[in-house]
UniProtKB/Swiss-Prot annotation:
<feature type="binding site">
    <location>
        <position position="305"/>
    </location>
    <ligand>
        <name>substrate</name>
    </ligand>
</feature>
<feature type="active site" description="Proton acceptor">
    <location>
        <position position="594"/>
    </location>
</feature>
<dbReference type="GO" id="GO:0005829">
    <property type="term" value="C:cytosol"/>
</dbReference>
<comment type="subunit">
    <text>Homotetramer.</text>
</comment>
<feature type="binding site">
    <location>
        <begin position="374"/>
        <end position="379"/>
    </location>
    <ligand>
        <name>substrate</name>
    </ligand>
</feature>
<keyword id="KW-0378">Hydrolase</keyword>
<dbReference type="GO" id="GO:0003876">
    <property type="term" value="F:AMP deaminase activity"/>
</dbReference>
<dbReference type="GO" id="GO:0046033">
    <property type="term" value="P:AMP metabolic process"/>
</dbReference>
<comment type="pathway">
    <text>Purine metabolism; IMP biosynthesis via salvage pathway; IMP from AMP: step 1/1.</text>
</comment>
<comment type="similarity">
    <text>Belongs to the metallo-dependent hydrolases superfamily. Adenosine and AMP deaminases family.</text>
</comment>
<dbReference type="GO" id="GO:0046872">
    <property type="term" value="F:metal ion binding"/>
</dbReference>
<dbReference type="InterPro" id="IPR006650">
    <property type="entry name" value="A/AMP_deam_AS"/>
</dbReference>
<keyword id="KW-0597">Phosphoprotein</keyword>
<feature type="binding site">
    <location>
        <position position="305"/>
    </location>
    <ligand>
        <name>Zn(2+)</name>
    </ligand>
</feature>
<dbReference type="Pfam" id="PF19326">
    <property type="entry name" value="AMP_deaminase"/>
</dbReference>
<dbReference type="GO" id="GO:0032263">
    <property type="term" value="P:GMP salvage"/>
</dbReference>
<feature type="binding site">
    <location>
        <position position="303"/>
    </location>
    <ligand>
        <name>Zn(2+)</name>
    </ligand>
</feature>
């Protein structure tokens, strides 16, 4: 596995660096001395470094450089212009025409109409000195190497283009990265049963043992007693903490903040100029594209919770329908007796006929803004937990039959719409080891299959609740309950047939809860191991994320070996809370949901752009909970070129129509004045981001969708203009090339 060679000096984080990282963390989460270290600005017009400090810093550095050997400065003479070298893919028909006097060359593509490019000449150090520019480039280069390492170890996605630049910087040949891609279950063939069990693999006979919060795999029990695990790439906590401390220090460095802030401003301004020059040409491309428009290009709801995947009217209609059909059916059990549906409503002093969407009270309103606790109460129809247990739970007296029926109806609506897909989340809490068997029995028993749905597992971060009630002895037990059954079903599928079939339909894991809840714990080498975490306090976000990633990494290696589908780590991140959440996600998450707090860190925002980390944004959800719609950074991120998609989060709480995803697109298009090309680009991003199979993506996006840039875009399927794809790709390569040029100057 081609991991990356960092110098000894770069690899070892000295005591001063670790101390600085801890100080930065303390100022971020405890508000010590303000929050300016990591979070330099909230409004993008404010420069992260004050003008006086920056002028003094540059003056000092220039004076310092004058007294040094002038060879380095001479190397920069004549380097005022940069020639953009776009790495060529094997299937690309791109040819580059070299233009000496311009920063970026103008590539010509066979499938891209001529369009007007923005070209800028002059110095490109973006407000920092030559010496600082070299430091910035080294830091950004190492940050990208860190992400690439963790993505490849866990069979998650890292784009080809940055890999090519990183290998060019290393002076190494690019290894085909397709072998590191995740594997998703292809759709069943016509007439094939999606719940078939005949092809389950045989038992491997491996032995499993959790050690330090991570499940280790042994060939047999004898090897386990000798502590000789199979040679999988197990996680190294010390390396992770060193990388984390490096990133903490990087995002707090003044020159890095200034450079990235100015590059982001440039990206935003450049896109606006591009739109002024080429908007009509993009529209002309779309008008000449037959049988394809925004309505019939594929779009995926990349972030939606199964328990709220229906709108409030749908839920109300189902409650009334179930009462009409099953009034005398026993549906609920209390300690005293079993209740029919009629008796249950009588006990609640209500009649379904009298219910309205207002009395159902599941919609988020003004009262939920900045009140996540009140938002969670909205999952209880009419404020009654009994109705939530009956209609929105998988484990109840009727074995989740009503919930399964609602989900099937939502799936049927998606099939009718044809071009909309969803990735609902089902919950595993880690309270007991039999949760997986119950959930898989519910899924397979009710035959919950929809060609327009793929599934994910969400793990709520509520260890503190379980520990306070003495359900769990320590955090390690929670991790064991979450992951051990999945390992066992992977090793011996025939003894866990339902779970093995269920796992074929799962594409990833999510980590969910209120991010604004303060932990106060900094994950470090001094942190207790999961087996030693017996206190009632909840571990930090980073602690949760690392141990989820670590187990997913080992699990993916095992499943890849067996020819099974693998899983992505796709947590909620950046909706609220500290910026360390986003820093952790940059290291180990395939993609994230929300990402609002990226607007507070230019360094992380720029890194998310360089690595093209997908972000599922939900402006309507944010509008009810954390951020007013007009202040949502969605448009800003789109203009800069971050890979964003639109999602609904919880249609039951936030939406009104039968097609909540179209409602999300419609409102965003009106508020942000999006063009058709903008919306189709976001829709294409959602398909790339999601966990549907390679075969389906090739059908929806084109056979070359794995290629980046216009070569990988089939306008006949995506309705995204080739001019837009060429602009995005050239701009991305230009920013990566700046880093490469900055590192060349240090040689």
């Amino acid at each position: 596995m081609p991991l990356f060679k960092l110098t000894g000096q770069g690899k070892q984080i000295d005591d001063a660096m670790r101390s600085f990282a801890e100080k930065v963390f303390a100022s971020e989460v405890k508000d010590e001395g303000g929050r300016h270290e990591i979070s330099p600005f909230d409004v993008d017009e404010i420069c992260p470094i004050s003008l006086r400090e920056m002028q003094a810093h540059i003056f000092h550095m220039e004076n310092l450089s004058m007294s040094m050997d002038g060879r380095r400065k001479r190397r920069f003479q004549g380097r005022k212009t940069v020639n953009l070298s776009i790495p060529q893919s094997e299937t690309s028909s791109t040819k580059l025409s070299h233009i000496e006097e311009f920063i970026s060359s103008s590539p010509t593509y066979e499938s891209v109409p001529d369009f007007q490019r923005v070209q800028i000449t002059g110095d490109y150090a973006s407000g920092v000195t030559v010496e600082d520019f070299e430091v910035v480039c080294k830091g950004l280069y190492r940050a990208l190497c860190i992400r690439e390492k963790y993505m490849q170890k866990s069979f998650q996605r890292f784009p080809k283009t940055p890999s090519k630049y990183l290998r060019n910087i290393d002076g190494e040949a690019l290894v085909a990265i397709e072998s590191f891609y995740p594997v998703f279950t292809p759709p069943p063939k016509k007439g094939e049963d999606p719940f078939r069990r005949e092809d389950l693999p045989a038992n491997l006979g491996y032995h499993l043992k959790m050690k330090g919060g991570v499940i280790y795999i042994y060939p047999d029990e004898a090897a386990a007693s000798r502590d000789e695990p199979k040679p999988y790439p197990y996680p190294n906590l010390d390396d992770f903490l060193d990388d984390m401390n490096f990133l903490l220090a990087l995002i707090a460095q003044g020159p890095v903040k200034t450079y990235t802030h100015r590059r982001l401003k440039f990206l935003s301004s450049k896109f606006q100029v591009h739109q002024m020059l080429n908007e009509m040409d993009e529209l002309k491309e779309l008008k000449n594209n037959p049988h394809r428009d925004f309505y019939n290009c594929r779009k995926v709801d990349t972030h939606i919770h199964a328990a709220a995947c229906m709108n409030q009217k749908h839920l109300l209609r189902f409650i009334k329908k179930s009462y009409h059909i099953d009034a005398d059916r026993v549906v609920y059990s209390t300690k005293e007796k079993n209740l029919t549906l009629k008796e249950l409503f009588a006990q609640l002093n209500m009649h379904p006929y009298d219910l309205t969407v207002d009395s159902l009270d599941v919609h988020a309103g003004r009262q939920t803004f900045q009140r996540f606790d009140k938002f969670n109460d909205k999952y209880n129809p009419v404020g009654a937990s009994e109705l939530r247990d009956l209609y929105l739970k998988t484990d109840n007296y009727i074995n989740g039959e009503y919930f399964a029926t609602i989900i099937k109806e939502v799936g049927a609506d998606l099939v009718d719409a044809k071009y909309q897909h969803a990735e609902p989340r089902l919950s595993i809490y880690g309270r007991s080891p039999d949760e997986w068997s119950k959930l898989s029995s519910w899924f397979v028993g009710n035959r919950i299959y929809c060609p327009n749905m793929t599934w994910m597992i969400q793990v709520p971060r509520i260890y503190d609740v379980f520990r306070s009630k003495n359900f769990l002895p320590h955090f390690g037990k929670m991790l064991e309950n979450i992951f051990l059954p999945v390992f066992e079903a992977t090793i011996n599928p025939q003894t866990h047939p339902d779970l093995s079939v269920f796992l074929k339909h799962i594409t990833g894991f999510d980590s969910v809860d209120d991010e604004s809840k303060h932990s106060g714990h900094m994950f470090s080498s001094k942190s207790p191991k999961p087996e030693e975490w017996t206190m009632e306090n909840n571990p930090s976000y980073t602690y949760y994320a690392y141990y989820m990633y670590a187990n997913i990494m080992v699990l993916n290696c095992l499943r890849k070996e067996r020819g099974m589908n693998t899983f992505l780590f796709r947590p909620h991140c950046g909706e609220a809370g500290a910026l360390t959440h986003l820093m952790t996600a940059f290291m180990i998450a395939d993609n994230i949901s929300h990402g609002l707090n990226l607007k507070k860190s230019p360094v992380l925002q720029y890194l998310f752009f360089l690595a093209q980390i997908p972000i599922a944004m939900s402006p309507l959800s944010n509008n009810s909970l954390f951020l007013e719609y007009a202040k949502n950074p969605f448009l800003d991120f789109l203009q800069k070129g971050l890979m964003i998609s639109l999602s609904t989060d919880d249609p039951m709480q936030f939406h009104f129509t039968k097609e909540p995803l179209m409602e999300e697109y419609a409102i965003a298009a009106q508020v942000f004045k999006l063009s058709t090309c903008d919306m189709c680009e976001v829709a294409r991003n959602s398909v790339l981001q999601c966990g549907i199979s390679h075969e389906e993506k090739a059908k929806f996006l084109g056979n070359n969708y794995l290629e980046e840039g216009p070569v990988g875009n089939d306008i006949r399927r995506t309705n995204v203009a080739q001019i837009r794809m060429a602009y995005r790709y050239e701009t991305w390569c230009y920013e990566l090339n700046l880093i490469a040029e900055g590192l060349k100057s240090t040689e």
